[in-house]
Regions:
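Hydrophobic transmembrane alpha-helices of multi-pass small-molecule transporters
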Residues: 60-63, 107, 175-180, 209-213, ...
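Small-residue-rich hydrophobic transmembrane alpha-helices
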Residues: 48-108, 112, 145-159, 163-164, ...
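Short runs within selected transmembrane alpha-helices of multi-pass transporters and secretion channels
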Residues: 69, 73, 138-156, 164-172, ...
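Structural signal for membrane-spanning alpha-helices in multi-pass inner-membrane proteins
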Residues: 110, 153, 179, 183, ...
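Transmembrane helical elements of multi-pass membrane transporters/channels
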Residues: 17-36, 137, 171, 204-208, ...
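Residue-level signal for short hydrophobic patches within transmembrane helices
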Residues: 8, 12-31, 35, 57-64, ...
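Short alpha-helical transmembrane segments in multi-pass integral membrane proteins
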Residues: 1-19, 76-143, 189-245, 301-366, ...
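Helix-terminus/linker motif at the lipid-water interface of multi-pass membrane proteins
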Residues: 27, 31-49, 118-125, 181-192, ...
Length: 450
């Protein structure tokens, strides 16, 4: 593959070649999320509630892995665009080294805090026990998650989306196949219940990492891991974290949001906590494909920005925004037309289904406009502008929605919380456009300094 294809290939075919593999793999991943929750829901409604309460911590682990991976991706893509392959190799080596450290620390911390964390949101001993049993197994694979995500972003940085797609799809499909086998037992496999769901996920994640490693050894890419760069360099570490920390916070903020909304909804009924948990499982089918487009966009934005191709950066942003809007239109339509059927996948309780129908119809009203915030935030990360990207996410997940949900719930109950979603998306979209335009207008020389 031509090293300069990211700045020479026609824009639309380039974007499609970079984003479609990621969209496909994200669709499979979102399907896994839904199927995994479907099987857990068959255990009991308490098991599904436990999964909903554990989700914010799982999301935090993923946020650290993906967020720091975004830093690796952006730094590598920028240096490749600038023609500095040594710095790109240094970023890859030290990025993977730091990913290992993150994985070890989070494994210990997350397993330790889970009992206390769960008791903050429920007094049900059955739910707490199920949550602890699930999290101990799931979080044992945290190191594999962080290293796997670092490799994912490394491959994306060099434009090798096919390897990422194949690795993610193999892991997800393995997970989907193993879920019912390990949860309910089949043949030689014993019935493991909720621990089976966690183990199936871990095995899928391990397979994904194994494929990345095999491909790296058999078919070397343009970026290499070298022993000479193992000793962390201060400038490189600062650069990785200057992008990785804001990106991590971007992705971790939903965990804070979900926990805050759970605390608000607890005052009304645990039914609404379950509804919120189901919504966050269902919305992955919309937002993960959109995220796939953004993942394909980041290295293109970073490479062309590093190469000084500012016009192409603007064109890439506009096309990706349109593609994201198309996905969000689809999400809005299905939430308006079949909310009851979607809720019925996870619960058979009539009251929960009715509450979920109302929630999905109201929240879905904000999907289309959310494409602006999602695309702008991803583009800024690709440009290495982590702080402006973080400001957008703070608006979406903290500054606007939490106060709005709290105030509206005082007047309208749980329905007020659902309305806070679309109100937040409208306000955040306006703020996102302002932040993006101001950030992109700044000179290149101030964007990234050695």
């Amino acid at each position: 593959m031509n090293d300069t294809f990211m700045k020479e290939k026609p824009i639309l075919p380039l974007i499609l070649s970079m984003t479609l593999p990621m969209v496909l793999s994200m669709l499979v991943n979102s399907l896994y999320n839904i199927i995994d929750s479907f099987f857990v829901a068959q255990i009991s409604e308490e098991a599904m509630t436990a999964l909903s309460l554990v989700y914010p911590v799982q999301n935090f682990i993923n946020a650290v892995g993906i967020g720091f991976g975004v830093g690796i991706n952006a730094v590598i893509a920028f240096h490749l665009g600038a023609g500095d392959h040594e710095k790109a190799d240094q970023a890859a080596t030290q990025g993977l080294e730091l990913a290992v450290i993150h994985g070890v620390v989070m494994t210990v911390c997350c397993i330790t805090i889970m009992p206390v964390f769960l008791r903050m949101f429920t007094s049900s001993e059955a739910v707490i026990e199920l949550g602890v049993r699930y999290s101990v197994v799931a979080f044992a694979f945290t190191l594999i998650v962080t290293v796997s995500m670092a490799f994912e972003k490394l491959y994306q940085a060099v434009g090798n989306m096919k390897t990422t797609m194949i690795s993610l799809m193999c892991g997800c499909i393995t997970n989907i196949v193993l879920d019912p086998v390990l949860i309910f037992g089949y043949g030689l496999f014993p019935e493991m219940g909720i621990e089976g769901a966690a183990l199936a996920t871990g095995i899928g994640q391990t397979l994904t990492l194994a494929i990345y490693l095999v491909v790296y050894l058999v078919r070397p890419i343009r970026v290499h891991i070298h022993r000479q760069y193992i000793l962390p360099g201060k400038k490189m570490v600062i650069k990785l974290y200057s992008i990785g920390i804001p990106a991590t916070l971007n992705l971790a903020l939903p965990s804070l949001l979900i926990s805050a909304l759970n605390a608000i909804l607890t005052a009304y009924s645990e039914v609404y906590i379950l509804v919120l948990g189901i919504y966050y499982k269902l919305q992955t089918f919309i937002y993960l494909p959109a995220n796939g487009i953004v993942q394909g966009m980041r290295p293109l934005i970073g490479y062309n920005y590093g190469a000084g191709e500012h016009k192409r950066v603007s064109q890439i942003y506009q096309i990706v925004l349109c593609m994201s809007c198309i996905i969000m239109v689809f999400g809005t339509v299905i939430c308006l037309l079949i909310p009851g059927q979607l809720m019925g996948l996870f619960t058979h309780t009539k009251a929960t289904i009715q509450a979920g129908e109302t929630a999905l119809r109201i929240i879905g009203a904000g999907f289309i406009v959310s494409a602006v915030s999602v695309t702008s935030s991803g583009a800024l990360e690709g440009l290495g502008k982590g702080t402006p990207s973080l400001l957008i996410s703070l608006c979406r997940y903290v500054v606007v929605i939490i106060p709005a949900a709290f105030l509206l719930s005082r007047f309208f109950g749980a329905v007020g919380v659902w309305n806070a979603f679309w109100i937040t998306e409208v306000i955040s979209a306006v703020i996102s456009l302002i932040i993006y335009r101001k950030s992109i207008a700044k000179p290149v020389t101030t964007a990234r300094k050695e």
